[in-house]
Amino acid sequence: MTLFDEEIARLDVERADLAARAARETNDGRRAYVDAIVARVERARATLAAAAAADSGVEKPTTTGGDGARVHARDLTPRRFRLEYVATDTPVVIEGLGSALTEDGADGETCAWLTRRAGNKKVAVTRKDGHRRATLSCEVTDVLDLKDFFAEVVDDRGAGSYLYDTSIPLKLPSLSESVRVPAYVAHDYMQRTMRLTAFSRSWPSLFVAAKNTRSSLHVDQWQGHFFMAMVRGTKRWTVFSRESLAFLRPSWSRGTLDPAMPPLEEQEEMGMLPLPREFGARRWDVDLGPGEVLFVPGGSPHAVRNLDCTVAFAGNFVDDVNLDRVLEDLKLMAAKDPALMESYRALDEVDFDDEGAALAAGDDDVHAGAFDANARVVRVADYLAGGRFV
């Protein structure tokens, strides 16, 4: 039995279990939600079956490449970013923003801004590498002052500890004066609705991690694009194309639209499934360092390892490229959880009508003269107001 055959057999069992679960569901909305999950299992199975039938001697999945593109911010306008990377589902690292990502300019990497503005704020910290697996909750958490946690990880006393995806606007609002959001994502549709959504104040969010911690191989909820701005340390990212999902041993048994997957390092040890290029499957590996910003296309599975103590902020965003997929998932989520229906309606009711601007080729603010990194960032208040989009 090949690796493909093993996965197909596992998905057959999973599909039968989920179909039975849907048949037992008495609530129409929740049944529609589970039916949608069943359809995703079936798509993954069909992809694997087609790949197994093709049996084309596909290469081992180690593609990195001009694939993992890097470009300096001086040469990349927001319009060009959207045309060349977002619209083509291509991950990219944007360099040269280190002096503009925080209020401390070129000294931002020391993170004095972090302890000065929010050092006495209580934060919930995950222990024992709790984000390594794609579970719905982390078992061990502590609550402590942010300055104390930061000192722990800097001094290498916080092994396995992670402050993960903590909303700055909601949980650490004083940091809203400290960080700057890359202008490349300031067109976020979630910030341009007439009514607030459940996600309007979720980002940017803060990540502070101890050396050697990991985040699980996962797909972000509702197909959101993702950005991360690195302030301190280095994260090793592995990003897969959206079409790679079926080849990463996805499991929908937990009953969510976004599947769980075994940790990347475990899959590599047991032998990863091939990533056939003819099916659009691709892998990118990249180290993200201080002053750099990473874009991950919506729906792309990804995993992260912190090579040392790291500080970063990040967020999801929506634009014309992933809007339809986001609305599809939000509508299904709202069928299961009616509280999300207002978020779906708030996003669906707006005619953003800026596709032409998004795909315009006019890079008219690339200058031959001195480059000012501050021209490529916006303040959090402007980002949340949706008033500084390109």
Q: Model-found features: residue ranges?
A:
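N-terminal accessory scaffold of Fe(II)-dependent oxygenases
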Residues: T2-V293, P301-V390
